[in-house]
C-alpha cells in the first residue's frame, strides 16, 4: 500500500512538470521582414552586412549609342571640327551648322593643303564651346597681290582650291606689295579671325610665290600682337605637298581693331566667326548616333543619370553622374536581413525578431505573429513600417543631388610642347577622381550605417510600445515574444497592434493565471535534470520495496532459498 501511494505521488509530480496547453493564455511575437537571399553592403563597422534590399549607385554600362534627343548632337563623320571650320572642301556641308555636342570620329581626315595649328586644342575648344560655325564675310581690301590661291592637294570638284574660309595671297605679276589692312569691331560681341602663314618647301618656291626671299606676317590688336616668319624647308610629303600652312587666330573685342601687316606668305582671313558663350562641347567617339533620350553622353554612348556615380568614362557631356573608380557601390534601402530558420520548437515559425526575421511578410517591414485559442495569425505594423520608409525614401535622390554634374567634363588636349602642363593636368584630374572615389565610398557607408541603425531602432520602438501596453499582463520571454497571461482572442490581439489595448480590463485575470501557472511551471533547463533525478529516486524506492517484500516472505516461510555447492 505504501509503495502504491509513493508511485502515484511520483507520477503526479512528474506529470506536473509538463506544460499544460491552456486556452487562457496567448503568445505574441514581434518581428521584421526578411528575405531568403539578401544583398551585402558596406558600413562603417562591417565590410559585408546583409540587408533585405539595396540599390546600386554606380552606372557601369552604357547604351552603346549616343542619344540625339535632349541635346543637338552633330555627327562630324569624316571631318574634324577644325577642318569644318577652315572650310575643307569635303566638309562644306558643315558651314553654318549649330550643335550642343560635336562628335568627332576616329575616321575623320583632312583633304586639303596640309596644315598644323600650334595651339590646336585651345582653338578647338573655343569653337566647340561656341556651338556654331556661323561665319560673316568681310570686305578686306588686298591690293598689289593675287587672291584666291589654290592647290592640287585641295580640290573642290575638278578644280584646284583651298580652304573656303581663308584667302591665299600670292604675288601679282612680279611683285608682292606690302599689305597694311585694318578692320574695326563695331559690334557688341567678340569676333574670331582665323589666318595663317605659308611655309614653302624650298627657297625657289618662296620667291616664285612671294618674290621676297622671306616674308613676314604681323597681326595686332590693342591687346595683342603676333609676328610670324615662314620656316622654309622640306617636310614629309602629304597629299603631294612638302610645304605647310600654320593656322593662327585672333579674337577682337568690341571697340578693338584688327591690324594685318605682311610682305609675303600671308594666308588671309575672309571674315570672322561669331563667338558665343555657351555650354556646347566636343567629344571623340565612334558610338552610333540614334533617336533616343538621355541627359548624359560619354564616348562609350549615352548612360542613364538616375544614379549618382558612373564608372563608364571620365569624359562626359550633360547632366551626368560623377565618375568614380569603383565599379559598384550599394546603398542599403532595407533593413538588416536575418533569414528565418526552419525549426523553432513548440511555436514553429512564431519566434520573435531576436532569433530571426520573417520571410513572406507582404504588408509591412515590421509586424506581429500570435498564437491563441483561435489559432495563429500575422499582420504588419503600418506605423513603424512607414516611419522607417519615410526616412529611407529620398536617400537616393539626396545622394544624386549632391553628386550629379550640372556641367560637362570636356576632353583636354595638349601639344607636345605642353607636355609638362599635360602631366600636371593629368595628375590633378587623377587626384580629383581619387578624392571623389573615396568620398563616394565614405558617403555610402555612412548612409548604410544610418539606415541599419534606424531600422533596428524602429524595431526596438515597436517592442517597447508593445511592452508598455501589456505591462504586468504579459511576460517578455526573451526572444522578441510576450506570453500573455489572460485569454486574448483575435480582437484583443488587434487592440495590441493598433495601440487601443486596455491592460486594466485584463489585469485581474492575468494576475490570477500568472500565479497559477507559476506554481507548477519550471524553467527550461532544469526540467530534464529534475525528471532524471525523480526517475532515479523512483527506481531506488521500487528496489527497496521489492527487497523488503522478499525478506518478509522469507521470514514467514512463504519463500525458501536453497544454496547448493
Swiss-Prot record:
Regions of this protein lying in the Cytoplasmic compartment: 551-565
Keywords annotated in UniProt: Clathrin- and caveolin-independent endocytosis of virus by host, Clathrin-mediated endocytosis of virus by host, Disulfide bond, Fusion of virus membrane with host endosomal membrane, Fusion of virus membrane with host membrane, Glycoprotein, Hemagglutinin, Host cell membrane, Host membrane, Host-virus interaction, Lipoprotein, Membrane, Palmitate, Signal, Transmembrane, Transmembrane helix, Viral attachment to host cell, Viral envelope protein, Viral penetration into host cytoplasm, Virion, Virus endocytosis by host, Virus entry into host cell
Extracellular side: 17-529
Membrane topology: Single-pass type I membrane protein
GO MF entries: host cell surface receptor binding
GO terms for biological process, alphabetical: clathrin-dependent endocytosis of virus by host cell; fusion of virus membrane with host endosome membrane; fusion of virus membrane with host plasma membrane; viral budding from plasma membrane; virion attachment to host cell
Record site: Cleavage: 344-345
Signal sequence coordinates: 1-16
Name assigned to this protein: Hemagglutinin
Source organism of this protein record: Influenza A virus (strain A/Equine/Tokyo/1971 H3N2)
Gene of this entry: HA
Amino acid at each position: 500500500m505504501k509503495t502504491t501511494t509513493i508511485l502515484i505521488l511520483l507520477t503526479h509530480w512528474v506529470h506536473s512538470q509538463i506544460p499544460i496547453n491552456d486556452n487562457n493564455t496567448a503568445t505574441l511575437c514581434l518581428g521584421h521582414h526578411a528575405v531568403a537571399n539578401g544583398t551585402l553592403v558596406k558600413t562603417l563597422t562591417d565590410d559585408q552586412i546583409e540587408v533585405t534590399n539595396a540599390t546600386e549607385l554606380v552606372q557601369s554600362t552604357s547604351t552603346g549609342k549616343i542619344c540625339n534627343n535632349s541635346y543637338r548632337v552633330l555627327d562630324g563623320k569624316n571631318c574634324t571640327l577644325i577642318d569644318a571650320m577652315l572650310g575643307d572642301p569635303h566638309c562644306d556641308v558643315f558651314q553654318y551648322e549649330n550643335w550642343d555636342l560635336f562628335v568627332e570620329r576616329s575616321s575623320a581626315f583632312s583633304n586639303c593643303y596640309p596644315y598644323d595649328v600650334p595651339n590646336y586644342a585651345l582653338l578647338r575648344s573655343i569653337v566647340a564651346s561656341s556651338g556654331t560655325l556661323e561665319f560673316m564675310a568681310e570686305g578686306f581690301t588686298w591690293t598689289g597681290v593675287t587672291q584666291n590661291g589654290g592647290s592640287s592637294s585641295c580640290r573642290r570638284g575638278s578644280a584646284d582650291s583651298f580652304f573656303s574660309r581663308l584667302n591665299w595671297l600670292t604675288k601679282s605679276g612680279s611683285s608682292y606689295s606690302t599689305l597694311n589692312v585694318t578692320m574695326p569691331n563695331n559690334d557688341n560681341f567678340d569676333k574670331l579671325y582665323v589666318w595663317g602663314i605659308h611655309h614653302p618647301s624650298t627657297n625657289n618656291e618662296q620667291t616664285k610665290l612671294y618674290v621676297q626671299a622671306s616674308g613676314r606676317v604681323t597681326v595686332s590688336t590693342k591687346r595683342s600682337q603676333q609676328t610670324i616668319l615662314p620656316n622654309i624647308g622640306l617636310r614629309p610629303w602629304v597629299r603631294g605637298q612638302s610645304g605647310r600652312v600654320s593656322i593662327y587666330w585672333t579674337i577682337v573685342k568690341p571697340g578693338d581693331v584688327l591690324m594685318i601687316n605682311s610682305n609675303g606668305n600671308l594666308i588671309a582671313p575672309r571674315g570672322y566667326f561669331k563667338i558665343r558663350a555657351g555650354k556646347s562641347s566636343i567629344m571623340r567617339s565612334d558610338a552610333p548616333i540614334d533617336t533616343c533620350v538621355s541627359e548624359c553622353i560619354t564616348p562609350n554612348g549615352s548612360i542613364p543619370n538616375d544614379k549618382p556615380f558612373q564608372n563608364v568614362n571620365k569624359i562626359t557631356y550633360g547632366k551626368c553622374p560623377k565618375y568614380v573608380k569603383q565599379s559598384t557601390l550599394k546603398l542599403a534601402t532595407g533593413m538588416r536581413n536575418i533569414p528565418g530558420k526552419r525549426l523553432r520548437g513548440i511555436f514553429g515559425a512564431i519566434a520573435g525578431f531576436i532569433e530571426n526575421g520573417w520571410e513572406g511578410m507582404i504588408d509591412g517591414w515590421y509586424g506581429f505573429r500570435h498564437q491563441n485559442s483561435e489559432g495563429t495569425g500575422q499582420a504588419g505594423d503600418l506605423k513603424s513600417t512607414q516611419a522607417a520608409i519615410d526616412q529611407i525614401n529620398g536617400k537616393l535622390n539626396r545622394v544624386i543631388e549632391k553628386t550629379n554634374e550640372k556641367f560637362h567634363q570636356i576632353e583636354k588636349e595638349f601639344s607636345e610642347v605642353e607636355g609638362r602642363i599635360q602631366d600636371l593636368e593629368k595628375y590633378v584630374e587623377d587626384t580629383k577622381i581619387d578624392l571623389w572615389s573615396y568620398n563616394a565610398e565614405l558617403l555610402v557607408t555612412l548612409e548604410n550605417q544610418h539606415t541599419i541603425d534606424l531600422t533596428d531602432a524602429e524595431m526596438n520602438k515597436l517592442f517597447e510600445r508593445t511592452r508598455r501596453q501589456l505591462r504586468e499582463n504579459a511576460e517578455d520571454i526573451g526572444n522578441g515574444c510576450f506570453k500573455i497571461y489572460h485569454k486574448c482572442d483575435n480582437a484583443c490581439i488587434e487592440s495590441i497592434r493598433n495601440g487601443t489595448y486596455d491592460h486594466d480590463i485584463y489585469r485581474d485575470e492575468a494576475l490570477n493565471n500568472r500565479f497559477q501557472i507559476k506554481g507548477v511551471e519550471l524553467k527550461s533547463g532544469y526540467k530534464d535534470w529534475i525528471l532524471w533525478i525523480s526517475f532515479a529516486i523512483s527506481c531506488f524506492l521500487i528496489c527497496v520495496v521489492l527487497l523488503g517484500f522478499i525478506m518478509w516472505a522469507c521470514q514467514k516461510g512463504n519463500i525458501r532459498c536453497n544454496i547448493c555447492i
